[in-house]
Amino acid sequence: MKRVFIDGSAGTTGLRIYERLAAREDLELLILPEELRKDTQARKEALNSCDVAFLCLPDQAAREAVSLLENDRVTVLDTSTAHRTDPGWAYGFPELGKDFQDKLLTSKRIAVPGCHASGFIALVKPLVDRGILQNTSRLSCHSVTGYSGGGKAMIAQYEVQERSELLGAPRQYGLTQSHKHLKEMAAICALEKPPVFSPIVGDFYSGMVVTVPLFVEDLSAGKTMADIQKAYEEQYTGPVVRYRPQMDEEGFLSGAGLSGKDAMEVTVCGNEERMVLIARYDNLGKGASGAAVQCLNLVLGCDQTTGLEL
């Protein structure tokens, strides 16, 4: 039986990971009393006595947690932004290819992808890898997410009885083009420049839809929407990320279509002049805790879908 410690188990992602793992008979969860959750010595002892540690912490706190590790047998799964572009860490998105799978399986340091970044990378990287898009491409992206993506503070803001009327409509943020996922988007896709990125939070708890619009002129010479469809069909053959030829729901596409699920659906819609690449998933599922548990399963050598809701 493997011992697992969740550092930051009281946060949104940490709680979801705990809920997924608590009933598993192949794992023993190390749980600190509430009064010791922020005690450095208690955390250090737990981090060094487990087999796998989840870090569900802000970036700086995650770095500090890593500095507490002295046991080189501990595998770390970090859900923060801190290590996602660090070459010494595996990037926890096995569907991106054999290199990603192999590094994940052999690494003791794994960075769990960001929620917005997961959709953008799933859509763009297979196209760059196949030369359908160039790494010099200037792309744009918008991403609509449920408010749980903002953590406990935003959840409380949206669910309080007397709240601002402004919360009833979608709200754009990241307006200065300095969102923390931009570096990750560019690095994993090997793009020279990150996209122009417009994240949007909506008045629904969880779910996410990420869109990358393209003109056919944005594609490499001679490439068409059919090449994109083929790329996704080839790339996503596993149980978690799936290509869907059509996601149209009577002319609409709901961002909450996979709320409560750990799968991701990708598709391309449009025509031979203009097209949109679309990824749909749950910001708390494949965008956070579901991806983390999938990585844990692979590290432990069990079915990657164990404990996932697909």
What role is predicted for each listed range?
Residues M1-Y173, C269-N271:
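N-terminal Rossmann-like NAD(P) cofactor-binding subdomain of oxidoreductases
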Residues T12-Y18, S118, A153, T211, ...:
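Short, electropositive, low-hydrophobicity segments enriched in small/polar residues
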Residues G119-F120, S220, T224, G287-A288:
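Secondary-structure boundary/capping motif
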